[in-house]
């Protein structure tokens, strides 16, 4: 059996949503016994669509890996990330995002908060890096003036760490 792809599950979800919309419309326009059979049919269709979705999203054991070519001139299979419609079993979501959705929150908010957190961390690291670079340069300048006999070692350390050389 071929692996279920993301587009298959996407189509199944769209079908479930369509059936829910049809049921909502049928309930809104409910006229009594004459529309009851139509409503029952729509509910049965929804049940079938949910069953299909459940079947497609059940975890299956991963397929065995394809045999590796022995000829080095044979081109390797394209990477999974290059596939626009990957198998469902290859998609892994961080548990934090799943918890966010379970708590009825928008996963885009999680993404935005994560990006802001990373930016803050990057700014902190940049500040520390600049502070240490400034400290390195000041220390080198002071060591050159206090211990002229170590000038060569100081220059070597500055070259190795990307510091400013004194002319």
Curated annotation (Swiss-Prot):
Q: What GO annotations for molecular function exist for this entry? A: transcription coregulator activity
Q: Got a GO cellular component term for this one?
A: mediator complex
Q: What are the protein's UniProt keywords?
A: Activator, Nucleus, Transcription, Transcription regulation
- Set out the biological process GO terms recorded for this chain's protein: regulation of transcription by RNA polymerase II
Q: Where found?
A: Nucleus
Segment Disordered: which positions? 54-92
Q: Which InterPro entries match?
A: Mediator_Med10
Domain of life per record? Eukaryota
Composition skew (Pro residues), residue ranges: 60-70
Q: Specify whether Membrane is a keyword of the entry.
A: no
**Is the keyword ATP-binding assigned to this protein?**
no
User: What is this protein for, i.e. what is its function?
Assistant: Component of the Mediator complex, a coactivator involved in the regulated transcription of nearly all RNA polymerase II-dependent genes. Mediator functions as a bridge to convey information from gene-specific regulatory proteins to the basal RNA polymerase II transcription machinery. Mediator is recruited to promoters by direct interactions with regulatory proteins and serves as a scaffold for the assembly of a functional preinitiation complex with RNA polymerase II and the general transcription factors.
Subunit: Component of the Mediator complex.
Q: Which family does it belong to?
A: Belongs to the Mediator complex subunit 10 family.
Q: What is this protein called?
A: Mediator of RNA polymerase II transcription subunit 10
